[in-house]
UniProtKB/Swiss-Prot annotation:
It comes from Solanum tuberosum (Potato). This is NADH-ubiquinone oxidoreductase 29 kDa subunit. Complex I is composed of about 45 different subunits. Its EC number is 7.1.1.2. The lineage of its organism: Eukaryota, Viridiplantae, Streptophyta, Embryophyta, Tracheophyta. It catalyses: a ubiquinone + NADH + 5 H(+)(in) = a ubiquinol + NAD(+) + 4 H(+)(out).
């Protein structure tokens, strides 16, 4: 898995949205 995938999987919902929409 990529670093982004790991961050999304490990991070909470808030971080998930931030990672998805923020980037």
């Amino acid at each position: 898995a990529t670093e982004a995938q790991a961050a999304i999987n490990e991070x909470p919902d808030r971080v998930k949205k931030d990672y998805f929409y923020g980037r």
